[in-house]
């Protein structure tokens, strides 16, 4: 088997050549060249596929390949020819020698028995019994003994049966020549075969414009209108659409064009009659006649200037005149015969025929029969265009006058119109074509010197365009200013159709039309009109070339111009070496349309990728700041011509599409010099306005992979050039440069920057008075200083974008996890940023020790006040005042019912989104009755099995589960049958379908099967199997115990092809019960082949079928069953339409079935009964009354070629009806959730699992428990984090769930813990001194809160303070108030409080309320660090009862009010919102003071309820995948306008344009807050010295630069 040389040495190459003809040799050489290219060797895989075919078993094919001399290098052509000649034309003696060589030893002198048996096992799977006779005298034999034995035992094994027994089943040449599709179609129309071949190319190009894949009215209308009026477009479409399926197939368009342009006059009139017969009832009613007259008059006005009487008559008079003269039935309508008599001499009808004649040739692609017809068609079109003049937005094409004159002589363009009867419809009598002035004279004066010809359809240039490639070419979206949207633009450099100009052709009427000189012109040559390009760069546009300016080109002398449809027709008929499209634009000064001959010729530069220097390991962790030593090189990459009237946006979109670059990843710069570039970011400016002239350089900038912009990075690296960015802009509308996947940072910074009270704090410089450079857990003030500097730049109003180098450097220094070029989580960066700002600005320089006490049954107000006081004793800053709130965490022991309550600070709410626990699946059900398949939509559990899928589908489609067969269809065949116990997979190789299969029914007599009885039961237990050679079936009996109602159509035992060779394994029983599978198949013919078996290769198409089949099924029943299912795809014409407008000779449906059934293997390529060496494509199943014993084979539905091309509706294959469940399922899957549902889920109760058991202080052991989170107090600035990234089932996934959230008047008060009013009878407390660390609490009144329940949610970020966690929870992520929030759907629960039990406070005076806080960058967790810290927190001074109870739902609710030494001042450090009044009584050492009598009566006062109403002011959005994607920010400026911050780009946009679907972090601001109250007074305070901080940064940056 491993022979390295050919085993056919006994047959020379020269001898083999003598046995093949020259034609055969040329075909074999061409086939070899097509298959192997320029190589002289054919690989093994190619040999098996192209020469032998897929039907040959792989082991056998490998043996043949090696015996021919094939090696790892390949098989030489000479050896291939020798082998093919031996197999097909070799003598028996030569074949015997060949077989001997297969089994012989290396020396080739003898065959060893052991080696032969080994090879037979590989090839055949067994050793024949007769082999022992061959080796009866020894273990090896020579050729003579082997030959004698072989000729006596020709059926011994596969090779002998193939080559010596029964003749050769494959030949070198296949002489059979079945009629081609074109020949068949030519026989049923008046078109020649060449016309049909030419027309097919045009048809597929037109059909490719369809949005649905069908040549429907939506596609047809824009192609023909104009010049066809829209009122006639539908009628014209219906005239082509014979079978009324809203699709014009190629047969229909061929017959229609034949009837309209080439048929007898009566047939043409019949075609027009169909156009006007709207209701298709065979007559023209009075209404239809009126519409016809209106349309015909419009056609006349569009195409002629002649005056006719009908133009001055009343419509009713015209209609009545026609009826009076031609209504032979006197029933008020015209029959077809009446219409034909009227239209023969009517000029209106003749003019409509002329128009249809033009459209059919120019638009639909029919080639004119004579040059004279061609000239009249083009002339008529141009005359009509000349009356309209130039229309802005249309494209015209320039043609060299030299070629145009030659063409005009060829078609006799200037001669008098030629009347060709009756083959030409251009016979308008005296109203035929007049001798008007040249059609272009009226538009000649409007030719300008500029315009745009940018085409969004990519032009395909090729030196030689084959008919196959042209026919399959699909056009894009048409010209940018296309007159016929969707039409193709087929420009090629060379496509010359050379016909003999001196030949005789028969016209449609049999008259001889003699084509005499002048000669037919060649391809259109426009080269003399253009200049040679001095720049050698790829042109991105399709202008074809720059026209010469010197000498000046003159219209009519140097060039002619034609509209786009005429150009396409001429190009289709002649070809061209150069297309010169020029669009029509309106002059900006005169507003008159003109042709722009000389558009702007632009030169486009691209950045040359710079090699990145390996950074030092020391400094790479200090932020990815660009190196200043990497100059950016820009090189000329492309050229392009654009209209001076085009906008930057249009050019940007075109370049993006042409270069296949996302629009958001590309920018354009105006290049003035190496050091002076201008960003073209105003998309509405036109080139003319920007004064961009010819040969202007533009830079195409493309984002780096790390999302940074090369030009920006270059500017940053050379900081002296950044000054050019300093241009006036709106304050705050400044972008941030991407420094390498830093959009996550930019997005968070922009959100925080648009937090107005915080920004005013930094802009006013107050942060410099509060820098805490000694905080051990801070950043020595660097974070606050760098952020403050950046904010001042962002709000200076002098720069369009800045580079956050210092802040990026600082973040990377203190948090290396944010370093590198990887995408990060913007929420994590936001948490780090807020925490860093808080610690750097913390007014508490010496943090006291605090102890966290257990709630131990104490009232919530007391525990909350204690926790909040502890928090404030260690954390006070502008960040605490604005962003911090308080959460209530309750854990309840399920053993003893003990409740432990904790109150923890937060700086944003992290709400997990409910992960999709359902999958959306759409499945198509195909029934046996042939009805249109129906698509159903299902919503299944993520772990659902196919059993559940079938059950749900059964409820929808009405079939029993036993009748549903699920199959994965791929490549028009069934690839897999999912098992019921398998889990449903969304990702399959093909698409999932459900087939109806027959089910057992009560027995029916086998003697009376009907066409619809697919489940008839057998009356006998007989079934058939095949003999060992696969030739004849023989009956066997079913063993006892098998069901006798429905018997499998398989064999009990099947040795496929008589052998078990690994290619066709034996199957014990049919895998199908009561049915078989059928596949659609057609034969694809090729003229270049090696063996006859490969000339016609099978190709599967369409959807496979399930065909009922039992042992009682007749062969005719199989045909009936198949026809029932496919008849909708190939329906014959209705009887009344059998005689169509083209003389229809199609007999493809004349016989009973348009297909033949054959028995095939599963792959559908080869026969299931015949051995492989017969190269059988499938044994035919005759349509008779015999029983059909198919076995376990498949059935191929071999379509008759004529029926396939003329009747089969390919577009109907994928047509399905959508069940209402599809829309319902899609809606349910994509249905958004609202923010309230997320909050309800967040505040719902959940059970802690066994791995997160709670240590109960009562039980003194770990117990199961439930946990619940609630909101206690809310901050002025509420940040809501939608947790799209979650860790589920061991992997991180992103939720694409859409969350709907309010932009204005968001009220979260319903989710605050309701207070008990009975506990609100108290007096406010006063601090013991004037120090800020001793808070004073004022009573506040609060509104009633409706108690609402919620379901589980997820993490909440808390403070870095030691009060982070309950000490009772086991160290587990789920043990925290945050991570124990599950991400499932919410489960409603109820609270005990009623609306009437909401708290009120009795404070007498207006108090300034402390805002909730979280000062930590760490999430709530049960880590050991937090657990230990929580034990250290003692109970501090207890805050006032009123504030603790009543203000939780109000801004800063439940917060102790801190009073500065300056009474009545607004203290930013304390986060007060309202001015306070000092209260008389206080507390000492945490003990409550006495309540005043005055305060005790406050409960009688009217409630002053203040709701925490919020407005949205910023959104951070994430688009794309997990671990990548992109962040952008939408924020509201103080000018009340919304802006989109996309890294360095900042653009104003309408609020409706905000992409809320991808929202990730929401920023809300409470209504009515006074920013000034957050600004601390700096009188008497000293500003921190930050010079050393600046020096540190400069020093570190210089070290970095040196290392670069």
From Swiss-Prot:
Gene: USP32
GO MF annotation: an example: calcium ion binding
UniProt keyword annotation of Metal-binding present: yes
Propeptide feature: residues: 1602-1604
Sites where the protein binds Ca(2+) 2: 277, 279, 281, 288
UniProt binding sites for Ca(2+) 1: 241, 243, 245, 247, 252
EC number: 3.4.19.12
Biased amino acid composition, Low complexity: 1367-1399
InterPro entries referenced in this protein's UniProt entry, alphabetically: DUSP-like_sf (IPR035927), EF-hand-dom_pair (IPR011992), EF_Hand_1_Ca_BS (IPR018247), EF_hand_dom (IPR002048), Papain-like_cys_pep_sf (IPR038765), Pept_C19_DUSP (IPR006615), Peptidase_C19_UCH (IPR001394), Ub_carboxyl-term_hydrolase (IPR050185)
Record region (Disordered): 1343-1362, 1367-1431
Residue list for modification Cysteine methyl ester: 1601
Domain DUSP: residue ranges: 369-585
Domain USP, chain residue ranges per copy: 734-1567
Membrane topology: Lipid-anchor
Name of the protein this chain belongs to: Ubiquitin carboxyl-terminal hydrolase 32
Family indicated by similarity: Belongs to the peptidase C19 family.
Entry function: Deubiquitinase that can remove conjugated ubiquitin from target proteins, such as RAB7A and LAMTOR1. Acts as a positive regulator of the mTORC1 signaling by mediating deubiquitination of LAMTOR1, thereby promoting the association between LAMTOR1 and the lysosomal V-ATPase complex and subsequent activation of the mTORC1 complex.
Domain EF-hand: 91-126, 228-263, 264-299
Catalytic activity: Thiol-dependent hydrolysis of ester, thioester, amide, peptide and isopeptide bonds formed by the C-terminal Gly of ubiquitin (a 76-residue protein attached to proteins as an intracellular targeting signal)
Localization in the cell: Golgi apparatus membrane
Residue numbers of Phosphotyrosine PTMs: 1173
């Amino acid at each position: 088997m491993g022979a390295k040389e050919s085993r056919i040495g006994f047959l020379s190459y020269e001898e083999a050549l003598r046995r093949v003809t020259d034609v055969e040799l040329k075909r074999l050489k061409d086939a070899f060249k097509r298959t192997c290219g320029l190589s002289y060797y054919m690989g093994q895989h190619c040999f098996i596929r192209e020469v032998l075919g897929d039907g040959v078993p792989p082991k056998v094919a490998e043996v043949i390949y090696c015996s021919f001399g094939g090696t790892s290098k390949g098989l030489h052509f000479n050896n291939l020819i020798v082998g093919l000649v031996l197999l097909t034309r070799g003598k028996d003696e030569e074949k015997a020698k060949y077989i001997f060589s297969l089994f012989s030893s290396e020396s080739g002198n003898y065959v060893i028995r052991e080696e032969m048996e080994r090879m037979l096992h590989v090839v055949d799977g067994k050793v024949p019994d007769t082999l022992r006779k061959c080796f009866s005298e020894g273990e090896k034999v020579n050729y003579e003994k082997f030959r004698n034995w072989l000729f006596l035992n020709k059926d011994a094994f596969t090779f002998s049966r193939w080559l010596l027994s029964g003749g050769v089943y494959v030949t070198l040449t296949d002489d059979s020549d079945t009629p081609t599709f074109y020949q068949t179609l030519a026989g049923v129309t008046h078109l020649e075969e060449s016309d049909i071949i030419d027309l097919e190319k045009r048809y597929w190009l037109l059909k490719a414009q369809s949005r649905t894949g069908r040549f429907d009215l939506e596609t047809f209308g824009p192609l023909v209108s104009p010049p066809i009026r829209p009122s006639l477009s539908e009628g014209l479409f219906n005239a082509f659409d014979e079978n009324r399926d809203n699709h014009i197939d190629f047969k229909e368009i061929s017959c229609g064009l034949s009837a309209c342009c080439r048929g007898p006059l009566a047939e043409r009139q019949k075609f027009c009659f169909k156009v006007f017969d709207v209701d298709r009832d065979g007559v023209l009613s009075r209404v239809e006649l009126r519409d016809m007259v209106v349309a015909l008059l419009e056609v006349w006005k569009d195409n002629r200037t002649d005056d006719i009487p009908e133009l001055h008559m009343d419509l009713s008079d015209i209609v009545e005149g026609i009826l009076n003269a031609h209504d032979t039935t006197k029933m008020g309508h015209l029959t077809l015969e009446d219409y034909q008599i009227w239209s023969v001499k009517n000029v209106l009808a003749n003019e409509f025929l002329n128009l249809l004649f033009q459209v059919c040739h120019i638009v639909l692609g029919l080639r004119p029969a004579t040059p004279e017809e061609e000239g009249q068609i083009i002339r008529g079109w141009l005359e009509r265009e000349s009356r309209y003049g130039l229309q802005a937005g249309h494209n015209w094409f320039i043609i060299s006058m030299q070629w145009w004159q030659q063409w005009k002589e060829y078609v006799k363009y200037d001669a008098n119109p030629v009347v060709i009867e009756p083959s030409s419809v251009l016979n308008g009598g005296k109203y035929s074509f007049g001798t008007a002035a040249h059609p272009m004279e009226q538009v000649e004066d409007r030719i300008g010197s500029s315009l745009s010809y940018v085409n969004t359809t990519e032009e395909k240039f090729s030196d030689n365009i084959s008919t196959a490639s042209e026919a399959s070419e699909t056009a894009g979206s048409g010209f940018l200013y296309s007159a016929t949207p969707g039409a193709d633009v087929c420009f090629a450099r060379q496509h010359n159709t050379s016909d003999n100009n001196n030949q005789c052709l028969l016209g449609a009427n049999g008259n001889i039309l003699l084509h005499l000189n002048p000669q037919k012109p060649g391809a259109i040559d426009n080269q003399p009109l253009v200049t040679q390009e001095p720049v050698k760069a790829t042109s991105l546009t399709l202008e074809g070339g720059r026209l010469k300016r010197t000498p000046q080109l003159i219209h009519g002398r140097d060039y002619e111009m034609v509209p786009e449809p005429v150009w396409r027709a001429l190009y289709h008929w002649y070809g061209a070496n150069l297309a010169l499209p020029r669009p029509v634009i309106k002059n900006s000064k005169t507003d008159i349309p003109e042709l722009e001959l000389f558009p702007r010729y632009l030169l486009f530069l691209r950045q040359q990728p710079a090699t990145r220097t390996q950074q030092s390991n020391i400094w790479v962790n200090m932020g990815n700041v660009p190196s200043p030593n990497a100059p950016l090189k820009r090189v000329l990459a492309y050229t392009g011509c654009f209209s001076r009237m085009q906008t930057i946006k249009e050019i940007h979109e075109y370049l993006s599409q042409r270069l296949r670059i996302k629009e958001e990843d590309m920018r354009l710069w105006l290049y003035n010099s190496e050091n002076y570039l201008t960003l073209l970011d105003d998309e509405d400016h036109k080139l003319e306005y920007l004064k961009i002239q010819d040969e202007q350089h533009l830079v195409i900038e493309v984002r780096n992979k790390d999302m940074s912009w090369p030009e920006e990075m270059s500017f940053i690296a050379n900081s002296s050039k950044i000054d050019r960015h300093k241009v006036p802009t709106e304050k705050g509308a400044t972008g941030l440069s991407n420094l390498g996947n830093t959009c996550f940072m930019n997005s968070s910074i922009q959100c925080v920057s648009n937090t107005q009270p915080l920004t005013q704090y930094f802009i006013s410089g107050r942060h410099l008075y509060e820098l805490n450079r000694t905080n051990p857990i801070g950043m020595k003030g660097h974070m606050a200083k760098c952020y403050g500097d950046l904010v001042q730049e962002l709000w200076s109003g002098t720069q369009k974008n800045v580079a956050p180098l210092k802040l990026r450097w600082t973040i990377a220094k203190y948090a290396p996890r944010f370093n590198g070029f990887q995408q990060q989580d913007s929420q994590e960066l936001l948490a780090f940023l807020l925490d860093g700002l808080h610690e750097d600005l913390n007014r508490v320089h010496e943090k006291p020790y605090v102890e966290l006490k257990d709630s131990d049954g104490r009232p919530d107000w007391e525990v909350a006040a204690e926790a909040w006081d502890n928090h404030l004793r260690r954390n006070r800053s502008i960040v605490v005042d604005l962003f911090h709130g308080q959460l209530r965490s309750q854990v309840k022991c399920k053993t003893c019912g003990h409740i432990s309550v904790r109150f923890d600070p937060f700086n944003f709410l992290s709400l997990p989104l409910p992960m999709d626990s359902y999958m959306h699946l759409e499945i198509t059900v195909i029934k046996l009755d042939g009805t249109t398949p129906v698509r159903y939509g299902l919503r299944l559990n993520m772990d659902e099995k196919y059993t559940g899928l079938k059950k749900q589908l059964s409820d929808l489609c009405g079939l029993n589960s036993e009748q549903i067969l699920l199959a994965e269809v791929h490549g028009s065949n069934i690839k897999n049958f999912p098992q019921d116990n398998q889990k449903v997979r969304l990702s399959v190789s093909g698409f999932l379908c459900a087939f109806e299969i027959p089910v057992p029914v009560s027995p029916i007599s086998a003697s009376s099967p009907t066409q619809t009885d697919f489940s008839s039961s057998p009356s006998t237990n007989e079934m058939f199997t095949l003999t060992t050679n696969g030739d004849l079936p023989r009956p066997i009996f079913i063993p006892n115990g098998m069901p006798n109602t429905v018997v499998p159509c398989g064999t009990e035992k099947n040795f496929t092809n008589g052998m078990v060779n690994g290619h066709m394994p034996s199957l014990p029983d049919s895998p199908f019960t009561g049915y078989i599978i059928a596949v659609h198949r057609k034969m694809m013919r090729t003229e270049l082949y090696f063996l006859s078996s490969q000339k016609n290769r099978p190709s599967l198409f369409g959807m496979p079928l399930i065909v009922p089949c039992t042992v009682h099924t007749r062969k005719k029943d199989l045909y009936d069953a198949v026809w029932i299912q496919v008849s909708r795809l190939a329906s014959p014409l209705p009887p009344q339409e059998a005689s169509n407008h083209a003389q229809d000779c199609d007999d493809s449906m004349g016989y009973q079935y348009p297909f033949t059934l054959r028995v095939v293997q599963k792959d559908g390529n080869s026969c299931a009964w015949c051995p492989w060496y017969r190269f059988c494509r499938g044994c035919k199943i005759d349509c008779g009354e015999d029983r059909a014993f198919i076995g376990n084979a498949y059935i191929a539905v071999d379509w008759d070629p004529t029926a396939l091309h003329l009747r089969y509706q390919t577009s109907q294959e994928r047509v399905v009806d959508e069940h209402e469940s599809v829309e319902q399922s899609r809606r349910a899957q994509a249905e958004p959730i609202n923010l309230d549902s997320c909050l309800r889920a967040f505040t719902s109760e959940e059970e802690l699992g066994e791995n997160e058991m709670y240590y109960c202080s009562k039980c003194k052991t770990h117990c199961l428990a439930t946990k619940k989170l609630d909101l206690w107090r809310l901050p002025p600035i509420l940040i809501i984090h939608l947790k799209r990234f979650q860790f589920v089932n061991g992997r991180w996934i992103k939720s694409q769930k859409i969350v709907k959230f309010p932009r204005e008047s968001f009220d979260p008060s319903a989710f605050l813990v309701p207070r008990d009013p009975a506990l609100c009878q108290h007096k406010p407390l006063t601090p013991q001194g004037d120090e800020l660390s001793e808070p004073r609490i004022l009573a506040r009144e609060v509104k009633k809160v409706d108690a609402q329940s919620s379901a589980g949610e997820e993490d909440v970020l808390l403070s870095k303070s030691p009060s982070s966690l309950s000490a009772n929870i086991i160290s587990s992520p789920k043990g925290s108030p945050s991570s124990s929030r599950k991400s499932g759907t919410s489960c409603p629960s109820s609270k005990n409080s009623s609306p009437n039990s909401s708290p009120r406070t009795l404070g007498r005076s207006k108090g300034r309320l402390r805002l909730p806080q979280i000062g930590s960058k760490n999430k709530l967790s049960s880590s050991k660090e937090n657990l230990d810290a929580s034990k250290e927190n003692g109970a501090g001074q207890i805050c006032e009862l009123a504030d603790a109870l009543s203000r939780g739902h109000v801004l800063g609710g439940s917060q102790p009010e801190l009073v500065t030494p300056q009474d009545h001042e607004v203290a930013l450090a304390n986060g007060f919102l309202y001015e306070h009044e000092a209260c008389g009584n206080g507390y000492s050492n945490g003990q409550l003071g006495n309540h005043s009598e005055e305060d005790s009566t406050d409960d009688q006062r009217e409630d002053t309820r203040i709701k925490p109403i919020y407005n949205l002011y910023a959104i951070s959005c994430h688009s794309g995948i997990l671990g990548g994607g992109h962040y952008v920010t939408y924020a509201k400026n103080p000018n009340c306008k919304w802006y989109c911050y996309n890294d360095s780009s900042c653009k104003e946009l309408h609020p409706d344009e905000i992409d809320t679907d991808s929202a990730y972090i929401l920023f809300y601001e409470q209504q009515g807050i006074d920013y000034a109250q957050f600004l601390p007074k700096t009188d008497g305070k000293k500003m921190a010295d930050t010079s050393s901080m600046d020096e540190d940064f400069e020093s570190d940056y210089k070290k970095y630069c040196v290392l670069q």
